[in-house]
Amino acid sequence: MAVRALKLLTTLLAVVAAASQAEVESEAGWGMVTPDLLFAEGTAAYARGDWPGVVLSMERALRSRAALRALRLRCRTQCAADFPWELDPDWSPSPAQASGAAALRDLSFFGGLLRRAACLRRCLGPPAAHSLSEEMELEFRKRSPYNYLQVAYFKINKLEKAVAAAHTFFVGNPEHMEMQQNLDYYQTMSGVKEADFKDLETQPHMQEFRLGVRLYSEEQPQEAVPHLEAALQEYFVAYEECRALCEGPYDYDGYNYLEYNADLFQAITDHYIQVLNCKQNCVTELASHPSREKPFEDFLPSHYNYLQFAYYNIGNYTQAVECAKTYLLFFPNDEVMNQNLAYYAAMLGEEHTRSIGPRESAKEYRQRSLLEKELLFFAYDVFGIPFVDPDSWTPEEVIPKRLQEKQKSERETAVRISQEIGNLMKEIETLVEEKTKESLDVSRLTREGGPLLYEGISLTMNSKLLNGSQRVVMDGVISDHECQELQRLTNVAATSGDGYRGQTSPHTPNEKFYGVTVFKALKLGQEGKVPLQSAHLYYNVTEKVRRIMESYFRLDTPLYFSYSHLVCRTAIEEVQAERKDDSHPVHVDNCILNAETLVCVKEPPAYTFRDYSAILYLNGDFDGGNFYFTELDAKTVTAEVQPQCGRAVGFSSGTENPHGVKAVTRGQRCAIALWFTLDPRHSERDRVQADDLVKMLFSPEEMDLSQEQPLDAQQGPPEPAQESLSGSESKPKDEL
């Protein structure tokens, strides 16, 4: 024991000597002027109109800050690798040594700590050389240097750099009206290209993620995958860098250091917990973008969610399973993802699906994060050091029971106060609503009651009878013969490929589905694999529904096809006995519905550009499959529609119309599902190709919409029938 203690003491003395030597060595190691001094020089040059001086100083300030950041990262990463926390797990003292064992363990721990500190001191240099005040750090975070630079570049006729600097500043300060005016001015100048408007401070992981999501939303999964995978790689790099930058000096929060009085272990605890808090908050920092008021929720897990869908859409089920299982690491009880996994198991086989595991990088990330959370919640419970968990996926068992009870009590108090305030506000709102509701309802009904255009079509239910707004049910849109012909088309076309591109989620394993898009049907007709006239009928019927929707809802802007397909769903008989799921759970077509909070977030992966939706039924000889509207809680059913040949349901795609489809429990349900947009930029590319193919294949006479003649456009609004569509009274992810 004496020999071991002597070795430790010798090591500690060597560390102290190395640290003092590092003081001398490092002073010459940092020769760059600090960012705050360079920023001050730049502002002074700006004040006297020295534009080249502004450019020189501000560019150097940005480079200096970047160099400091790189130095911290390099030093902390290298020293952590060279001097890890290592306690000898195999060393266990004998009973005779027990009295001194604890002291030796402490010396071993602090010996490693001192060695790493000496390494950092030698690598970083004097603390004063790389410290910025909180105010100066804020200036750089606000991208203030680019505000000065854009003016200076403009003054010295460096237009391309001026545009980039202005855009970079505006991305970080989207409310800055003067910079918006500058950018508008730059756009009018000759010689300015779209590529000049670039963000010089963009984070690679966020750039790749946003690009991947945009491609996914534009129904280009093949192109989206490499960007989403790159976003993951860049995320983990940025995450480790962010964590390393957290290992700075202790923040005393203003002048609290004057009263700070802690012993050795309390001081270590305070600083270490502050560092852990910072590391956990890297989740929020990396999920933030200046263009958004709030960070992306569940940012890292959402990567695997998008990838799972994208891999599914391109037919790579193995990768889809891996991403689904990785997502389930964070949300093991997610109903939709578990259904997706069951679907993949049915496609790939149970054994093969079991052999695919979640990604190791995500497993390690989750394990480390949970261990840190345990320490942070323990410190919150015992020492009262607050910790706000940035993740929604943290298991409840990580939080100490006493803290759970305390948080539950606080939440209940907050909810009670909120409810009391809400009740008062609701009483006021009710009084106002009662006075305006009747006039608004009359206005909406009058607005949406346009002509149905074609003979034989009858209005069955309007918004009032459907207990909502912007809703309609029509009968007689197509004939029985046309229903049968289109149903046959689906069954024949499916043998040449299901044509089902662009769906946002795998479907229930309790039903088989197959379908065909308009363009695919026409191509198969051109190749002689399906009757060409049937494919042409399909094309004409979709155009007919589009015109009816435009007319009935009295739209001032034309509707464009966003996505359309003819699809049949067949119940698998042997799995219907204990079935509890829907064909499609309740959702909203252009936003992500959170039924618990009654909020629908209009952002990808939702198809945010969709404005109106319609479904045209081809048959009713099956059990189940009823379409239903609900409130935002996804539980309160407001109306239900029973499918039958020629019946169409139309509605606006927003939060006013959450809807779902009940399970098909026997037989086959066939329908044409259509989504429309008012924005021509999101017009379906397949539809444009279909239009061109129809012009090539058919004469102008054959291209007429149908042999039916439109009714007089000046006719009065049709009157709805009064009976319930489902034959009974209405009782209180992305196909219709």
Swiss-Prot record:
Fe cation binds at H587, D589, H659. SUPFAM superfamilies: TPR-like. GO terms for molecular function: iron ion binding; L-ascorbic acid binding; procollagen-proline 3-dioxygenase activity. Keywords: Coiled coil, Dioxygenase, Dwarfism, Endoplasmic reticulum, Extracellular matrix, Glycoprotein, Iron, Metal-binding, Osteogenesis imperfecta, Oxidoreductase, Proteoglycan, Repeat, Secreted, Signal, TPR repeat, Vitamin C. The active site is at R669. It catalyses: L-prolyl-[collagen] + 2-oxoglutarate + O2 = trans-3-hydroxy-L-prolyl-[collagen] + succinate + CO2. It is an enzyme of class 1 (oxidoreductase). GO terms for cellular component: cytoplasm; endoplasmic reticulum; endoplasmic reticulum lumen; extracellular exosome; membrane; nucleus; protein-containing complex. GO terms for biological process: bone development; chaperone-mediated protein folding; collagen fibril organization; collagen metabolic process; negative regulation of cell growth; negative regulation of cell population proliferation; negative regulation of post-translational protein modification; positive regulation of neuron projection development. The keyword Oxidoreductase applies. TPR repeats lie at residues 35-68, 143-176, 205-238, 301-334. It is linked to Osteogenesis imperfecta 8: A form of osteogenesis imperfecta, a disorder of bone formation characterized by low bone mass, bone fragility and susceptibility to fractures after minimal trauma. Disease severity ranges from very mild forms without fractures to intrauterine fractures and perinatal lethality. Extraskeletal manifestations, which affect a variable number of patients, are dentinogenesis imperfecta, hearing loss, and blue sclerae. OI8 is characterized by disproportionate short stature, shortening of the long bones, white sclerae, a round face and a short barrel-shaped chest. This is Prolyl 3-hydroxylase 1.
